[in-house]
């Protein structure tokens, strides 16, 4: 029991960076992911409440081009401006809709990109 108390004391004295490094080392050593038990615990609880909480906490969004609309040239120009892609790559993305224009962006940036693309004539989803 004294050994466990010593381990608790040692862990309590770790800095945040040291704790993160310890977590990574344990994940590698044991072949597990620290995120998995949290997700399972959330799913095991009140399923409806957990889903609503996950929806509220979402911080990264994907901007999906669902349809280029009638004004495809303006949409291609806007996609090029947003992504920095070349003309051919932007054209392929627009013609291959539905496709992700940008992934893992903030809510504000996703709303801004959606407005720009819709102003150019595209139909856009934010997920």
UniProtKB/Swiss-Prot annotation:
Entry-linked CDD domains: Ribosomal_L7_L12
User: One of this protein's Pfam families, by short name?
Assistant: Ribosomal_L12
Assembly and oligomerization: Homodimer. Part of the ribosomal stalk of the 50S ribosomal subunit. Forms a multimeric L10(L12)X complex, where L10 forms an elongated spine to which 2 to 4 L12 dimers bind in a sequential fashion. Binds GTP-bound translation factors.
Known role: Forms part of the ribosomal stalk which helps the ribosome interact with GTP-bound translation factors. Is thus essential for accurate translation.
Know the name of this protein? Large ribosomal subunit protein bL12
The top of its lineage is: Bacteria, Pseudomonadati, Pseudomonadota, Alphaproteobacteria, Hyphomicrobiales
What are the GO MF terms of this UniProt record?
A: mRNA binding; structural constituent of ribosome
Highest taxon, organism lineage: Bacteria
Keyword S-adenosyl-L-methionine assigned: no
Query: InterPro entries from the xrefs?
Result: Ribosomal_bL12, Ribosomal_bL12_C, Ribosomal_bL12_C/ClpS-like, Ribosomal_bL12_oligo, Ribosomal_bL12_oligo_N_sf
Please give an example of a GO cellular component term from this record. cytosolic large ribosomal subunit
Quote the PANTHER family the UniProt record gives. Answer: 39S RIBOSOMAL PROTEIN L12, LARGE RIBOSOMAL SUBUNIT PROTEIN BL12M
Q: Which GO terms describe its biological process?
A: translation
Provide the alphabetized UniProt keywords: Ribonucleoprotein, Ribosomal protein
The text of the family note is: Belongs to the bacterial ribosomal protein bL12 family.
